[in-house]
Amino acid sequence: MAKSIKDHLQDALSNIGADNLRRFQSRLGDRKQEPRVRKSTIEKLKDEIDLVDLLVNTFTSDAVSVTVDILRGIKCNAVAEELLENTGQGGVSQPEPPVPEPIPKDPAQLKELKVTPCSQQFKNKILREKGQETYEIKDKSVRKRLALLINNVDFDDKAMKRSGSEKDEENMEKLLKELDYQVVKRPNLSAKEMDEAIRDFAQREEHKYSDSAFVVIMSHGKRDAIMGVHYHRTNNPSDSFPVDNVYRRLNSENCPALRDKPKVILIQACRGGEHGRVWASDGEPDEPIEIEDDDFVHKEKDFISLMSCTPDTKSYRHVQNGTFYVQTLVDVFIKCAHEDHIEELFRKVLRRFEHPNMIGNFKQMACKDRATLPKLFYLFPGL
């Protein structure tokens, strides 16, 4: 027997999880268009069945389109599209994309959040529709994913200390673990030690049993190099690590275990200028927030990189909460990795940097670099 509209609505709402269901009900109560639903009515609902009855009785033939709009509003896009497909309403026009969100006002929120898990239903749908266009993801029970995390905080030149980057390290490590990567941490390295760390990482046996890898480097930098902890502009300018060496160490020749597997490179550093700044939020004019800048860097198949800023520009860091780049990237991955492939996740990060209130009067734009992924890389968190 064919399913009714109520059945499809109940399937969709049962598939979004308890947290998203609460967000759905909150959005429904906040809806301004007529007919409106009283919040007191929503508070009396016992389960998804009651919610579906309310949707159908209130919106009648528009119940599906209203549900889809709210699902998209809470970023359950995959469930929304599946509902449209299952109800034969795939021609419903999509709303205008929302204004990109700024980074969380309280970056400590990131510590509380977990990556939204991917549903098996969504994964099956992607593999069914785009299987030949996606990278193979190994079964969680047998794979051994690795991520390398290099964070230079303390430099010989005390003035170069990257205050706040400990928070970046904490947030990035949490994200990578949530995505099922074992994190190899190497703090405070010279240029030579960075090269050795990436070389050793490339030789790890676990890559044979992995489907992908992440390399995250956070430091000061220049346009095409990352600074080691012994760097000094006049006394030791040679302690800098060419970004090209990241790609050379991980290419198909030097790291055959990762051949034809996606390798994601994330670099937080500046690409020009070295002076700290002070920025005051419009909302807190009496409490200036100290902002510093990091200097930055850059090359194969199956690589994709997201740099914290474009060439010849600065990358800003809050001296307590960490960089805007890492805060934004982690927030996007937490909320969207369950339904977006890696390039779409990066695009959403870039959209956030367009937001006029991102970091006040300072301008910074993250930069996708050396993207050589011939296929779509879905992380399918939780699966």
UniProtKB/Swiss-Prot annotation:
What sections of the sequence does the record tag as coiled-coil?
Answer: none
Which residue numbers fall in the propeptide?
A: 1-142, 275-296
Keywords in alphabetical order, please: Cytoplasm, Hydrolase, Inflammasome, Protease, Thiol protease, Zymogen
Q: Which InterPro entries match?
A: Caspase-like_dom_sf, Caspase_cys_AS, Caspase_his_AS, DAPIN, DEATH-like_dom_sf, Pept_C14, Pept_C14_caspase, Pept_C14_p10
For this protein, what is the EC number? 3.4.22.36
- Active-site residues (renumbered): H220, C270
Asked if the record carries the keyword Flavoprotein, the reply is no
Q: Where in the cell is it found?
A: Inflammasome; Cytoplasm
Q: Record's Gene Ontology CC terms?
A: canonical inflammasome complex; cytoplasm; cytosol; NLRP1 inflammasome complex
Entry function? Thiol protease which cleaves IL-1 beta (il1b), releasing the mature cytokine which is involved in a variety of inflammatory processes, and mediates apoptosis. Component of the NLRP1 inflammasome, which plays a crucial role in innate immunity and inflammation. In response to pathogens and other damage-associated signals, recruited to the NLRP1 inflammasome in its precursor form. Its subsequent activation causes the cleavage of pro-il1b into the midformed il1b, which then evetually leads to il1b maturation and secretion in the extracellular milieu.
Subunit arrangement?
Answer: Heterotetramer that consists of two anti-parallel arranged heterodimers, each one formed by a 20 kDa (p20) and a 10 kDa (p10) subunit. Interacts (via pyrin domain) with pycard (via pyrin domain). Interacts with caspb. Component of NLRP1 inflammasomes. Inflammasomes are supramolecular complexes that assemble in the cytosol in response to pathogens and other damage-associated signals and play critical roles in innate immunity and inflammation.
Q: Which family does it belong to?
A: Belongs to the peptidase C14A family.
What is the name listed in the Swiss-Prot or TrEMBL entry for this protein? Caspase a
Q: List the source organism.
A: Danio rerio
